[in-house]
């Protein structure tokens, strides 16, 4: 993606985020944007909207169907995108909006990877440790199970990592022996 396109995506996303903040509907917009992203990720819609073989009217029709479950602000936002013929950028714009709203809310996904499933008490304890160590006011717990880490856990949030896995400890030990 070139710089001009990236700047365009950021400008569109910034405008909706500002409206959401101004009207105090950040969570509502975040939920709606997440639902739209889900639609894009479970369908071929991104390919259709970026295809040159599909007419502008057909693209407009697809975007109109997305608007049926959206708030007025998001409907207006989608209409502006269609009017400016930026349908091909809709998915990256939505992803950018989602990232910006996560920053605004401070609701970073806290990914915890373990070798086996955790009990609710263990999840809560690791979640609290992650929030404290990574200086996050709040977040969403996302659990992953990866037997290859052997034991321990890996916490990943806001581009920060706490790796207390047995695999990592063995790797560090191996490096010391060299």
From Swiss-Prot:
The Gene Ontology CC terms held by the record are: plasma membrane; proton-transporting ATP synthase complex
**Location(s) in or outside the cell:** Cell membrane
Principal location listed in the UniProt entry: membrane
Write the record's keywords in alphabetical order, separated by commas: ATP synthesis, Cell membrane, CF(1), Hydrogen ion transport, Ion transport, Membrane, Transport
Q: What InterPro entries is this protein classified in?
A: ATP_synth_OSCP/delta_N_sf, ATPase_OSCP/dsu
Its record classes its membrane topology as: Peripheral membrane protein
The record's section on SUPFAM superfamilies has: N-terminal domain of the delta subunit of the F1F0-ATP synthase
Keyword match Transport = yes
Q: Name one Pfam family in it.
A: OSCP
Question: What molecular functions are annotated in GO for this chain?
Answer: proton-transporting ATP synthase activity, rotational mechanism
Q: Does the keyword Transport apply?
A: yes
Q: What HAMAP family does its record include? A: ATP_synth_delta_bact
Description of how the protein assembles with itself and partners: F-type ATPases have 2 components, F(1) - the catalytic core - and F(0) - the membrane proton channel. F(1) has five subunits: alpha(3), beta(3), gamma(1), delta(1), epsilon(1). F(0) has three main subunits: a(1), b(2) and c(10-14). The alpha and beta chains form an alternating ring which encloses part of the gamma chain. F(1) is attached to F(0) by a central stalk formed by the gamma and epsilon chains, while a peripheral stalk is formed by the delta and b chains.
Which family does the record assign? Belongs to the ATPase delta chain family.
Q: What does this protein do?
A: F(1)F(0) ATP synthase produces ATP from ADP in the presence of a proton or sodium gradient. F-type ATPases consist of two structural domains, F(1) containing the extramembraneous catalytic core and F(0) containing the membrane proton channel, linked together by a central stalk and a peripheral stalk. During catalysis, ATP synthesis in the catalytic domain of F(1) is coupled via a rotary mechanism of the central stalk subunits to proton translocation. This protein is part of the stalk that links CF(0) to CF(1). It either transmits conformational changes from CF(0) to CF(1) or is implicated in proton conduction.
Protein name as it appears in the record: ATP synthase subunit delta
Q: Which organism is it from?
A: Streptococcus agalactiae serotype Ia (strain ATCC 27591 / A909 / CDC SS700)
């Amino acid at each position: 993606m070139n710089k001009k396109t990236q700047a365009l995506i950021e400008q569109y996303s910034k405008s909706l985020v500002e409206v959401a903040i101004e009207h105090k509907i950040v969570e509502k917009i975040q939920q709606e944007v997440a639902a739209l992203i889900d639609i894009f990720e479970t369908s071929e819609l991104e390919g259709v909207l970026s295809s040159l073989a599909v007419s502008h009217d057909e693209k407009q029709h697809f975007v109109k169907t997305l608007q049926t479950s959206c708030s007025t602000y998001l409907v207006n936002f989608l209409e502006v995108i269609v009017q400016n013929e930026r349908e091909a950028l809709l998915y990256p714009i939505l992803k950018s909006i989602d990232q910006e709203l996560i920053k605004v809310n401070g609701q970073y996904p806290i990914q915890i990877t373990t070798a086996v499933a955790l009990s609710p008490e263990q999840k809560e304890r690791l979640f609290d440790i992650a929030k404290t160590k990574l200086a996050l006011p709040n977040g969403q717990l996302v659990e992953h199970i990866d037997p290859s880490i052997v034991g321990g856990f890996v916490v990943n949030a806001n581009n920060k990592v706490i790796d207390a896995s047995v695999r990592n400890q063995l790797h560090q030990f191996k490096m010391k022996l060299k």
